[in-house]
From Swiss-Prot:
Function, as annotated: Blocks infection by several different human immunodeficiency virus type 1 (HIV-1) strains. This occurs because vMIP-II binds to a wide range of chemokine receptors. May form part of the response to host defenses contributing to virus-induced neoplasia and may have relevance to KSHV and HIV-I interactions.
PROSITE patterns for the chain: SMALL_CYTOKINES_CC
UniProt record similarity statement: Belongs to the intercrine beta (chemokine CC) family.
Assigned keywords, A-Z: Cytokine, Disulfide bond, Secreted, Signal
Any single GO BP term: immune response
Name the record gives this protein: Viral macrophage inflammatory protein 2
Gene: ORF K4
SUPFAM superfamilies, alphabetized: Interleukin 8-like chemokines (SSF54117)
Gene Ontology cellular-component terms listed: extracellular space; protein-containing complex
Length: 94
């Protein structure tokens, strides 16, 4: 195999590894839970059990509230209603 062929195979292999996220760097830096959008209306505290912050690696910083039914709801941590709920509910370790 000539040099161009070897180079082409190496580049294609590297691209496949990066795309699949199988490399150590790609999977190690991937945050577990990020918010893609935020809950717009305030949530009643009676429906919630706890909360935890999103990873600092997420593009949208937020808070994830856990409901008593086991659902997760993203909220903007800069909103007053979110700050109030964060003070009233326990933090869940994630």
């Amino acid at each position: 195999m000539d040099t161009k062929g070897i180079l082409l195979v190496a580049v294609l292999t590297a691209l496949l590894c990066l795309q699949s996220g199988d490399t150590l760097g790609a999977s190690w830096h991937r945050p577990d839970k990020c918010c893609l959008g935020y809950q717009k209306r305030p949530l009643p505290q009676v429906l919630l059990s706890s909360w935890y912050p999103t990873s600092q690696l997420c593009s949208k910083p937020g808070v994830i509230f856990l409901t008593k039914r086991g659902r997760q709801v993203c909220a903007d941590k800069s909103k007053d209603w979110v700050k109030k709920l964060m003070q009233q509910l326990p933090v869940t370790a994630r």
